[in-house]
Swiss-Prot record:
Name recorded for this polypeptide: E3 ubiquitin-protein ligase ipaH9.8
LRR repeat spans: 57-77, 78-99, 100-117, 118-139, 140-157, 158-179, 182-203, 205-228
Compartments where found: Secreted; Host cytoplasm; Host nucleus
Entry annotation: catalytic residues: C337 (glycyl thioester intermediate)
One GO term of the biological process aspect: proteasome-mediated ubiquitin-dependent protein catabolic process
SUPFAM superfamilies: L domain-like (SSF52058)
Gene name of the encoded protein: ipaH9.8
Species of origin: Shigella flexneri
Length: 545
């Protein structure tokens, strides 16, 4: 390898004169470009990297995060990877024909040059592109999300992954599959697409198309649902949402959104309190969430719903930690349909109860804590069931599936945190048989797994630390003694039995398993002891609802 001086002020000897002569045109153009730097640009660093790349004949050139407003016209001809992301570029020069990977995300590009014929990866998300040039047949992956693109050129047959979220696309491209074995995943979420072309059915059933948050026509959704529900359907899996993607991005002040849930005689005091939280993270989206929550079927039809929300908001105003958690949970809820808001409300109520349990609300009411734990366990199992159901559907809005199991089983499984109504159950794909099977599975797993689950539940541990400090300390001492005396040998025995001694990944996995088994044994014993003391009149309460 040729010796390199970082500032590339080449010594005057015959060896370096030869190099300098070979690259004279490049060096001269780059030096001139460097002298034209605008304030804040790191063109000196860019030129250093350019010269190093050229002299070393490197196939990668990385000029990202240098605040560059332009690039020199003559890039090294041999490069296969160019990274110029996170700059201030408004255009790109002619690209080397050898280029296979182009990274130019988070710039200000309004157009792209002709793309090299061997290009395999194009990453130009977060720019100002309005259209794309012809795409080379070699292209495998492309990310054009967060641009202003209205239509797409023909997609190469080789393209496996396309991300075109948050553009202005009004239609999907034509899909031609034939016998092509490529497994594709294409994302067109949050565009302006109203119709789905029949050519989408040409894709294989291993492919996935994401079209959530688009204004799909009233005819497109039921037609696709009928088609994809057919036993003969062998097309791609299509992810959609009941949202039209047109949510209002204007948020009224947080205090105004909060006070709307309270009686008029309380609004002045509430407004004064909540004004102090206007600038907390996610405050704007939380405001929008509250407004959308007021328009759900539960808010319109459920008696006492407004009072329930007001009481919850009072608790948030008194706890910065709970408020921070709740703002974060609600952050994305305004970007989807009404049922997404309802599901978020379920999650917010769970967050409140778990927070209260951890903070001591149930320290003197073990029976109530058990009931809460049982509900959290049931919801966890329902999420597993919903996740499995999603995998079986070809045309699916995941939010509707998750909410359907919670809403439709809320009464039978005594789910106090679940809304009792949802708007779009009909598109969830969840059948009456699914619900019967889910209820039976929850009860079976609860009978067999709840005791162990509860003994490891964080809020229960918080209660034990506060109210059974001596017993908790003894359990922790027992755990650390095991770690010191038994843990290494148990891990070694497990690795030996599986023939994986010396495998670092297997050792980590075996260690985690041994630790969990140990904690399960110790905390289960502690749990049984404490519950026997606190609930002597109902020793079976842990095992039955």
């Amino acid at each position: 390898m040729l010796p390199i001086n970082n500032n590339f002020s080449l010594p005057q000897n015959s060896f370096y004169n030869t190099i300098s002569g070979t690259y004279a045109d490049y060096f001269s153009a780059w030096d001139k470009w460097e002298k034209q730097a605008l304030p804040g640009e790191e063109r000196d660093e860019a030129v250093s990297r350019l010269k190093e790349c050229l002299i070393n004949n490197s196939d990668e050139l990385r000029l990202d995060r240098l605040n560059l407003s332009s690039l020199p016209d003559n890039l090294p001809a041999q490069i296969t990877l160019l990274n110029v992301s996170y700059n201030q570029l408004t255009n790109l020069p002619e690209l080397p024909v050898t280029l296979k990977k182009l990274y130019s995300a988070s710039n200000k590009l309004s157009e792209l040059p002709v793309l090299p014929p061997a290009l395999e990866s194009l990453q130009v998300q977060h720019n100002e592109l309005e259209n794309l040039p012809a795409l080379p047949d070699s292209l495998l992956t492309m990310n054009i999300s967060y641009n202003e693109i209205v239509s797409l050129p023909s997609l190469p047959q080789a393209l496996k992954n396309l991300r075109a979220t948050r553009n202005f696309l009004t239609e999907l491209p034509a899909f031609s599959e034939g016998n092509n074995p490529v497994v594709r995943e294409y994302f067109f979420d949050r565009n302006q697409i109203s119709h789905i072309p029949e050519s989408i059915l040409n894709l294989r059933n291993e492919c996935s198309i994401h079209i959530s948050d688009n204004p799909l026509s009233s005819h497109a959704l039921p037609a696709l649902q009928r088609l994809t529900s057919s036993p003969d359907y062998h097309g791609p899996r299509i992810y959609f949402s009941m949202s039209d993607g047109q949510q209002n991005t204007l948020h009224r002040p947080l205090a105004d959104a909060v006070t709307a849930w309270f009686p008029e005689n309380k609004q002045s005091d509430v407004s004064q309190i909540w004004h102090a939280f206007e600038h907390e993270e996610h405050a704007n989206t939380f405001s929008a969430f509250l407004d959308r929550l007021s328009d759900t079927v539960s808010a319109r039809n459920t008696s006492g719903f407004r009072e329930q929300v007001a009481a919850w908001l009072e608790k948030l105003s008194a706890s910065a930690e709970l408020r921070q958690q709740s703002f974060a949970v609600a952050a994305d809820a305004t970007e989807s349909c009404e049922d997404r808001v309802a599901l978020t409300w379920n999650n917010l109520r769970k967050t409140l109860l778990v927070h209260q349990a951890s903070e001591g609300l149930f320290d003197n009411d073990t029976g109530a804590l058990l009931s809460l734990g049982r509900e959290m366990f049931r919801l966890e199992i329902l999420e597993d069931i919903a996740r499995d159901k999603v995998r079986t559907l070809h045309f699916v809005d995941e939010i509707e599936v998750y909410l359907a199991f919670q809403t439709m089983l809320a009464e039978k499984l005594q789910l106090s945190t679940a809304v009792k109504e949802m708007r779009f159950y009909g598109v969830s794909g969840v059948t009456a048989n699914d619900l019967r099977t889910a209820e039976a599975m929850v009860r079976s797993r609860e009978e067999n797994e709840f005791t162990d689950w509860f003994s490891l539940w964080g809020p229960w541990h918080a209660v034990l630390k506060r109210t059974e400090a001596d017993r908790w300390a003894q359990a922790e001492e027992q755990k650390y003694e095991m770690l010191e005396n038994e843990y290494p040998q148990r891990v070694a025995d497990r690795l030996k039995a599986s023939g994986l001694s010396g495998d670092a990944d297997a050792e980590r996995e075996a260690g985690a398993q041994v630790m969990r088994e140990t904690e399960q044994q110790i905390y289960r014993q502690l749990t049984d002891e404490v519950l026997a003391l606190r609930l002597p009149e109902n020793g079976s309460q842990l095992h039955h609802s």
